[in-house]
């Protein structure tokens, strides 16, 4: 029987494309694929705050004060996320798409893990808003706490169970009646997309994707093993990354009052 081990580069290309596409499609965070550190190494991420005043100056005069910048650094350990799967030569003969489907499933699991890490970082938000009930008013109040002049990049993510709260809201119904909602998006509030996800349970977030950043190595590592006797092929997919709350000014946590 022919050896059906795939070229590592082929699997790597498939996994890289799927992983990057699925993370970006969520539009939850900024993706930076320039990470150079290895798993277990530390990367320090600094959050900067600039303070200063623009002054009018007459001819020959200078500023009365200077601007300054401060920063808080936090160390993050680079993670290794790995998925492994096996297939036999006989499996491939029965269905030659089995490896493609396994790569797709493996990268989806890896993506879900990164989503969990995103939620962990989002929970570190320093600005919060507590509402008696969740609905139009709660979202509007949270948006005001983000305090952005340009709200075009804002979006809201909510627990799947909270969709009913919004859909029953009279203000929402008046604004959205008759419209069709597609692909998991609940709709918009004040022109801002509201997205429901099972990754959240008891809190929502109003944010831009600048709040959380995913630092990920550009290349997906692929390793394979083969047991010639049983014709079993093992495939390992690995990716190194860090998920970090990088801009706490761009996110507000919303909770329901107990």
Q: Where are these predicted regions, by residue range?
A:
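Extended oligomerization regions of viral-like shell subunits
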Residues: 43, 137-229
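Short, structured patches in soluble enzyme cores that scaffold and shape functional sites
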Residues: 89, 158-160, 239
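N-terminal "assembly arms/tails" that initiate or stabilize quaternary assembly
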Residues: 1-71, 213-223, 228-230, 234, ...
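Extended, compositionally biased alpha-helical segments that mediate assembly or anchoring
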Residues: 226, 230-258
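Alpha-helical scaffold segments that mediate packing/assembly in large oligomeric complexes
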Residues: 82, 86-151, 253-258
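Short helix/loop capping segments that flank catalytic or ligand/cofactor-binding pockets
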Residues: 53-56, 95, 165-167, 244-246
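Short glycine/proline-enriched loop/turn "hinge" motifs that connect secondary-structure elements
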Residues: 70-79
